[in-house]
Regions:
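Extended, alpha-helix-rich binding/interface surfaces that flank or overlap catalytic cores
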Residues: 22
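N-terminal, post-signal-peptide region of Sec/Tat-exported proteins
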Residues: 15-16, 25-27
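Conserved SGNH/GDSL esterase-like catalytic core that processes O-acyl groups on lipids
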Residues: 26-147, 157-251
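Membrane/wall-proximal cationic-aromatic binding patches
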Residues: 1-19
Length: 251
């Protein structure tokens, strides 16, 4: 089987596993144990892909955000009716900056940030990572700053793009604290952040509460495809249960 051959070579190349499921895998349940065992055996570090605002807390990550971030969800009974498109990417959700309409005009700049600290309750290998990957699209240019341990590490501009785009940053050792800062007059859409090692196994924990597993056919294929090509997964695990059972009304 090709996947197991890739696992054998994982210490020299990344192997990505995307674990989708319903609420039974929330909080990194199952994914976390599987990640720890495979990373210990075949190499790898980091918690993998997660949204700016997770639906529930995960032991594998330790992040916080400024209060002006909002989450837009595209699965189960939680679909945001204010969104007039289905471009949700691989996590079936995205996050954006909520602007104050009373203060905003075409020249107003708004700021938001994401703080990521080393998790203190995760498995050991989740606490080490040397790569940060940001998946986004932007209607206007966005000033982006990355602070490591309260010192500016990188300043850049996220280009205007309708497609989901990857911003990648590498560092020599795991920072105790990272702060991602965004400044723009139009919010970017952030589809996910990934923390990874140089090589080895990456396992993404993607819980979709209330989902039946049919969501793959309900979102925009182009958006999903763009992000999946950037992620380049080697294996999908689909773990859906009771939400797939049709409701039957007795007469």
């Amino acid at each position: 089987y090709p996947f197991f051959k890739k696992l054998e070579n994982a210490k020299n190349k990344k192997v990505r596993i995307m674990h989708y499921g319903d609420s039974q895998i929330e909080g990194d349940r199952i994914s976390g144990r599987l990640r720890q065992r495979l990373q210990r055996e075949f190499g790898g570090n980091g918690a993998g892909l997660f949204p700016v605002i997770p639906a529930t807390k995960k032991i594998s990550i330790n992040n916080s955000v400024s209060k002006n971030w909002v989450r837009k969800t595209g699965f189960g009974p939680y679909i945001d009716k204010t969104i007039n498109h289905k471009n949700y990417g691989a996590l079936f959700s995205f996050c954006k900056i909520k602007f104050d309409t009373l203060l905003s005009d075409s020249n107003s700049l708004f700021n938001a940030d994401i703080t990521i600290n080393i998790p203190n309750k995760s498995y050991k290998l989740c606490r080490n990572y040397k790569k940060l990957k940001l998946y986004y699209s932007a209607k206007e240019k966005v000033t982006f700053r990355l602070l490591l341990n309260d010192s500016i590490f990188h300043i850049d501009t996220l280009s205007k793009t309708n497609e989901i785009t990857l911003k990648r940053l590498d560092f020599s050792e795991t920072p105790k604290s990272m702060k991602l800062q965004f400044s723009s007059n139009k919010s970017p859409d952030i589809y996910g952040v990934s923390l990874e090692g140089e090589n080895g196994v990456i396992i993404d924990n993607i819980p979709l509460r209330g989902a039946s597993g049919t969501e793959f056919s309900k979102v925009n294929y182009s958006s999903l495809s763009q992000m999946q090509k950037l992620l380049s997964p080697d294996l999908f695990i689909l773990e859906f249960g009771g939400n797939t059972i049709p409701y039957i009304k007795s007469k």
